[in-house]
UniProtKB/Swiss-Prot annotation:
This is D-alanine--D-alanine ligase. Pathway: Cell wall biogenesis; peptidoglycan biosynthesis. Mg(2+) 1 binds at residues 251, 267. It holds the Pfam family Dala_Dala_lig_N. Residues 107-300 form the ATP-grasp domain. Its main location: cytoplasm. It comes from Ruegeria sp. (strain TM1040). It is an enzyme of class 6 (ligase). Keywords: ATP-binding, Cell shape, Cell wall biogenesis/degradation, Cytoplasm, Ligase, Magnesium, Manganese, Metal-binding, Nucleotide-binding, Peptidoglycan synthesis.
């Protein structure tokens, strides 16, 4: 996608915003803006807020690079706004973004595609704190928040139900705990890049994802070819059944003792992190793309109505 007279497009870097993941979004936006400038693009950094429409009208960008995370940025809201303004934007569109953000509905889509998922129920927060709504071990998380914010693990020997924070919504997802290795695959367009094995001291939480040294990434994962092929296939099918575009990242758990039957899909992230410790840029680099080239590819892939 080119700007006026065949020049590189002018890019508005949408970052920050009001969600719980604001700080990660700011980090993502700064890194992507720096990388794009290194590729020759003019980039204007925009801290997305109530005056976003006025800011975009003033900037008149050719492309909006969506570096927002969490609510409003990856749930279809800002995508709908950009469609209304007719500004081509990166990453997934309105429907795919909204669907992926809603864990219950995205699981329903995965099931229709024959993808293996973990059993779960949606329950009232009050009920979850009063009793075990499913047998431990299980995980409690918001149905529509990302980056493992507010996730609770209830272990098998736990007698008392979890006491959830005030930040947790009135309705939460209670999901059977999936044992095994945490792995992830980035899809770029119609290509699954590689499998990363994520090694941490415990649950892959918000700190492990975004803090330097919070986790160790092994790529390609040291797993049998059969499992790697399944991860690639499942990630690509998840990307397609949700209707994603640009890049997405799908997370898995694999219980080695059960072989191929032990691989389950956890969720797909339509706005994967783009920070120095992020998984998708590492996978792109593994297949020969620099961070700057990955960001430039996203800009060239930007569009409306798909």
């Amino acid at each position: 996608m080119g700007g006026a007279s065949g020049t590189l497009p002018k890019v508005a870097m949408l970052m920050g915003g009001p969600s719980a993941e604001r700080e990660v979004s700011l980090s993502t936006g700064r890194e992507c803006a720096r990388a794009l400038r290194g590729q020759g693009y003019e980039v204007v950094e925009v801290d997305a807020g109530p005056d976003l429409v006025a800011q975009l009208n003033d900037i008149k960008p050719d492309v909006a690079f969506n570096a927002l995370h969490g609510r409003w940025g990856e749930d279809g809201c800002v995508q709908g706004l950009l469609e209304w303004l007719r500004i081509p934007y990166t990453h997934s569109g309105v429907l795919a973004s909204a669907l992926a953000m809603d864990k219950e509905r995205s699981k329903a889509a995965y099931r229709t595609a024959g993808l293996p998922v973990v059993d779960s129920v949606i329950a009232a927060k009050a009920d979850v704190m009063a009793r075990h709504v499913i047998a431990p071990p299980y995980v409690v998380k918001p149905n529509n928040e990302g980056s493992s914010v507010g996730i609770y693990i209830v272990h098998e020997a736990t007698n008392s139900p979890p006491q959830l924070s005030e930040e947790m919504p009135a309705q939460v997802m209670v999901e059977a705990y999936a044992p095994g290795r945490e792995m992830t695959v980035t899809v770029m367009g119609d290509r699954a890049l590689c499998v990363t094995d994520i090694l941490t001291d415990g649950w892959y939480d918000y700190e492990a994802k975004y803090a330097t040294g919070g986790s160790r990434h092994v790529l390609p994962a040291e797993i049998p070819d059969e499992i790697a092929d399944l991860c690639h296939d499942y990630a690509l099918r998840a990307h397609q059944v949700l209707g994603c575009r640009g890049i997405s990242r799908t997370d898995f758990r694999w219980d080695e003792a059960r072989g191929a039957d032990g691989l389950v899909l956890l969720e797909t992230n339509t706005q994967p992190g783009m920070t120095p410790t992020s998984l998708s840029p590492e996978q792109a680099e593994h297949v020969g793309l620099t961070f700057g080239q990955l960001c430039a590819w996203l800009v060239e892939d930007a569009s409306c109505e798909r």
